[in-house]
């Protein structure tokens, strides 16, 4: 496609107008090499109004996609199917650019290195950031929440993502981690020492309409109560991460 964007940034949101407006305001007037896609439930009129409000400020292409209250990872796959950028990445509602030239620097790195996938640096105000190097992929250490790779810092070539059939939606909470592991088994990422995204504190309750994250809402509401249901959900998360960790370490050469 002629004049197609270099990067498509995809935000999957649900009834989270305040945070969505924060992200859209951050990305308005960025490079024309960036496409911004918002995926929301078809009955989320508040988020649609936010998109309508900010779209006029965009120098780049922006589009909105309505889904039928599907799960968050299904919605992320839907966003990729409509993306026209050479590369894709995923930001949550509330995430922001660290600086006005962050994306320009990132795009220069993508164009010069032409990687299958890239990991940049992010600003995490709610935990210690993970420092990466090119010698080994780190971040799959259980029970150490500071050691992980956030999907907001991962940029993948769209054709690479498509060839892997997108996110594996069998996972309720760890499909993004599964995707990172799968990509790392094929080829190691290019590490770019570029601060791009300020990652907002997770707001799991904003996804209450999405079935694949329905259990997470329980955590956000009952986390301090120590209920058996919360502990059961913790076991789901732990089981998924242990499965991925074991699969990763067994196949690692």
Please identify what each model-predicted range represents.
Residues 5-8, 35, 178:
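Cell-envelope/extracellular polymer assembly enzymes that use nucleotide-activated donors
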Residues 10, 132-216:
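Conserved nucleotide-sugar donor-binding catalytic segment
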Residues 67-83:
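Glycine-rich, basic loop-to-helix element that forms the pyrophosphate-binding segment
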């Amino acid at each position: 496609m002629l004049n197609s964007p270099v990067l498509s940034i995809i935000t999957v949101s649900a009834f989270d107008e305040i945070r969505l407006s924060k992200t859209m305001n951050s990305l308005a007037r960025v490079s024309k090499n960036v496409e911004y896609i918002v995926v929301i439930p078809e009955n989320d009129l508040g988020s649609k109004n936010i998109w309508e409000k900010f779209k006029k400020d965009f120098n780049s292409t922006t589009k909105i996609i309505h889904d039928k209250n599907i799960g968050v990872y299904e919605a992320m796959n839907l966003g990729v199917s409509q993306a026209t950028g050479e590369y894709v990445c995923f930001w949550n509602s509330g995430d922001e650019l660290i600086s006005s030239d962050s994306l320009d620097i990132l795009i220069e790195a993508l164009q010069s290195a032409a990687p299958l996938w890239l990991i940049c640096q992010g600003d995490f105000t709610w935990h210690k950031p993970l420092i990466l190097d090119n010698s080994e992929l780190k971040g799959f250490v259980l029970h150490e929440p500071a050691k992980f790779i956030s999907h907001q810092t991962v940029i993948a070539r769209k054709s690479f993502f498509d060839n892997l059939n997108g996110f594996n939606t069998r996972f309720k909470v760890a499909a993004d981690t599964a995707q990172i592991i799968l990509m790392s088994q094929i080829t190691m990422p290019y590490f770019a020492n570029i601060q791009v995204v300020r990652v907002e504190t997770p707001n799991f309750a904003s996804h209450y309409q999405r079935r694949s994250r329905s259990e997470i809402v329980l955590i956000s509401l009952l986390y301090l109560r120590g209920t058996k249901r919360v502990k059961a959900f913790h076991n789901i998360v732990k089981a998924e991460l242990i499965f991925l960790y074991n699969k990763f370490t067994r196949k690692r050469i």
